[in-house]
């Protein structure tokens, strides 16, 4: 690591102008949360592998900012050369730089890896001390990274209409209407999942998220896709030709954005497409007829710098909300995917319960007793990785399976307190029947993306562990049972999941819920359920998906999280105050909760009824996928409970 920092500091000194500091973001050219191996620059320089974070290298210091999900992981992975900066507790990176770097300091960042929003915010902060943000045109990290992985060459795959549910031409029509409404003549699309959604295409360029490295531009009469043409088969080319989409090289996007700015970007299909004929009838609002729509959160500064800032509409992409509002076909597919996925999770729990009893002498999923301290042989012992591999194999046997939706968080004991723990084969823990086991996992299916967390104990949980699990469960149920007026955002609802924990002075450092894509990214906006102010931006709306995942974590001891995916539906209420209309949630995740971890005396009658109803549905819905042994286990796991049980 010292050699990497030393090499970067040499490049910083020789840069023109010389750099006093270098920022290395987590994001790629598309501001993605999950990036390809080739784009993990921040991980390369720091050794920290979490999905969120930012590295800052000065002449004498190296600091890494990350959020509460990764505090423990960062402490474990960072060398002594690095200082951990805790987001939400320590100063923001721009505040720290403004306060600690000298006046007129030059602060460098790759202009392709920083968003318009971030670059503008930093620029304003630095101006207080005449500091300058230097957006470099080449990435200094790439010059140091001699073993950088090659570019991904996975093919562009057309996503069938039977799963997408809405044609590209209809999406074009909707978006062009929004362009007209905003007085814009074009939209620059940088987010990978937005490009995939708009053109009904998928790929495997990024692990766990079925997207292709590509940009897009949509105007009132043309459509462009910027992708490495070697990824586009003859069949895919025919598909794009039929849509009137011009395919250009990935690297052409920056010159074409400059052409777009001067209204000189012309498609060879422009005069042939139905979209063009429709566009001739569209009258752009005369007061601002020349604006270009750019999402400041997903568009990189490199592209934005080619535009006339006076003629740019900086606001969230219209695709983000359209993608979040699932069509009927997507909703049906997501629900079906969660049924198959739930079956795999239950089959996994049945297998794991049997293995823990057989190999470790555990009392098992249903009984409370300390293990007999039986030890398996070296070849038969279970680890966090070997058991998660079993779960993946069970998922892989299900129809339409295409891979995992994120690295499985298979965590025992103190590892479960690391919120986004990722076990490695060489350095993972062995399963322990006397410790809590947390498994947060998900999969990609052609008809939907899944995300589920269950926490279990195969021995005798302590009273404190039960107390904490029960509080998490009560918050999970409270949020899932909420009814609320239309226009309500996730910031308002977040307290429902935390209140039972707050009663004991407990809390958790992550958000409570995120949107889930339709065979796309497992983390999807623009909505969320969270304590963070950004959760105020977009209200929850019918047909959105959102997770319900409160938790509690004790460093060095254990972690608990429960997670289901919910669909937002219209609610039938007795009254309709303010004529707003009301919404409610529908659970679409199916796997039992471990009753022996719940203090039933702490549950209300409503919570008991909800648990019994959910378990009854769970049993009936998953029954067709179970063999006799699995069905017997599931029946036992979903038996009705009462306060006196």
UniProtKB/Swiss-Prot annotation:
Chief subcellular location: cytoplasm
Q: Any idea which UniProt keywords this protein has?
A: Acetylation, Aminopeptidase, Cell membrane, Cytoplasm, Endoplasmic reticulum, Glycoprotein, Hydrolase, Manganese, Membrane, Metal-binding, Metalloprotease, Microsome, Protease
- UniProt enzyme class: hydrolase
| Regulation of its function | Inhibited by EGTA and apstatin, and, to some extent, by the flavonoid kaempferol.
Q: Which GO terms describe its cellular component?
A: cytoplasm; cytosol; endoplasmic reticulum; plasma membrane
What remark does the entry make about the cofactor? Binds 2 manganese or zinc ions per subunit.
Q: Where does a peptide bind?
A: 69, 420, 514, 523, 549
Q: Which SUPFAM superfamilies match?
A: Creatinase/aminopeptidase, Creatinase/prolidase N-terminal domain
GO-annotated molecular function = aminopeptidase activity; manganese ion binding; metalloaminopeptidase activity; N-1-naphthylphthalamic acid binding; zinc ion binding
Which reactions fall under this protein's catalytic activity? Release of any N-terminal amino acid, including proline, that is linked to proline, even from a dipeptide or tripeptide
Q: Where in the cell is it found?
A: Cytoplasm; Cell membrane; Microsome membrane
Cited InterPro entries? Creatin/AminoP/Spt16_N (IPR029149), Creatinase/aminopeptidase-like (IPR036005), Creatinase_N (IPR000587), Pept_M24 (IPR000994), Pept_M24B (IPR033740), Peptidase_M24_C (IPR032416), Peptidase_M24B_aminopep-P_CS (IPR001131), X-Pro_aminopeptidase_P (IPR050422)
Which tissues is it found in, per the record?
A: Ubiquitous with preferential expression in 5 days-old seedlings, roots, flowers, inflorescences and rosette leaves (at protein levels).
**Recorded E.C. number(s)?**
3.4.11.9
Residues the entry annotates as binding Mn(2+) 1: 440, 451, 563
Locate the residues binding Mn(2+) 2. 451, 514, 549, 563
What residues bear N-acetylserine in this entry?
2
Q: Which cofactor does it need?
A: Mn(2+); Zn(2+)
Q: Which PROSITE patterns match?
A: PROLINE_PEPTIDASE
Residues passing through the membrane, by range: none
PTM characteristics: Glycosylated. Also present in a non-glycosylated form.
Instruction: Give the way it sits in the membrane.
Output: Peripheral membrane protein
Q: What does this protein do?
A: Catalyzes the removal of a penultimate prolyl residue from the N-termini of peptides, such as Arg-Pro-Pro. Aminopeptidase that binds to the auxin transport inhibitor N-1-naphthylphthalamic acid (NPA). May play a negative role in the regulation of PIN auxin transport proteins.
Q: What is its quaternary makeup?
A: Homodimer. Interacts with N-1-naphthylphthalamic acid (NPA).
Family statement: Belongs to the peptidase M24B family.
For this entry, the protein name equals Aminopeptidase P1
